[in-house]
């Protein structure tokens, strides 16, 4: 059974596992797969307000559909921010890491920094 059945997920987890977590095993419990199938955060996105929310969305995400992420942004109530990055789901952690981490840092400083 495969929990995240995309080529980029397989590449990310196997390559990252070798480099950063050499004892990691490519295994998942049936309960985790069951919980993953029930994971629908879009159903709760309106309840985040009035807390600020930032969505960093990959333009070509096949793991978490880009269209679904944009729909979530549209459903979210203000205050909300959206950034779209080039690439797929895992590029925010590698190829676009400088940009995604800067965006996240700036958002956190703006909303969680000293007042």
Explain the meaning of each model-derived region.
Residues 62-80:
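Active-site-adjacent alpha-helix of alpha/beta-hydrolase-fold enzymes
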Residues 37-40, 57, 62-68:
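Conserved alpha/beta-hydrolase "acid-adjacent" motif
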Residues 48-49, 54-57:
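Short beta-strand/loop motif that positions the catalytic acidic residue
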Residues 103-114:
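C-terminal alpha-helix
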Residues 87-101:
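Catalytic histidine-centered segment of alpha/beta-hydrolase-like enzymes
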Residues 1-44:
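Alpha/beta-hydrolase
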Residues 46-49, 75-77:
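Short, conserved loop/helix-junction motifs that constitute active-site signature segments
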Residues 83:
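General small-molecule cofactor/ligand-binding pocket signal
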């Amino acid at each position: 059974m495969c929990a995240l059945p995309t080529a980029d997920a397989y590449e990310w987890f196997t390559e990252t596992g070798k480099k950063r977590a050499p004892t990691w095993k490519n295994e998942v419990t049936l309960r985790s797969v069951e919980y993953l199938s029930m994971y629908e955060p879009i159903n709760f996105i309106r309840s985040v307000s009035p807390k600020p929310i930032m969505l960093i969305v990959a333009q070509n995400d096949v793991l978490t559909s880009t269209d679904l992420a944009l729909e979530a942004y549209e459903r979210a109530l203000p205050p909300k921010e959206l950034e779209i990055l080039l690439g797929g789901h895992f590029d925010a952690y590698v190829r676009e890491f400088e940009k995604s981490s800067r965006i996240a840092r700036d958002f956190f400083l703006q909303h969680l920094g000293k007042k």
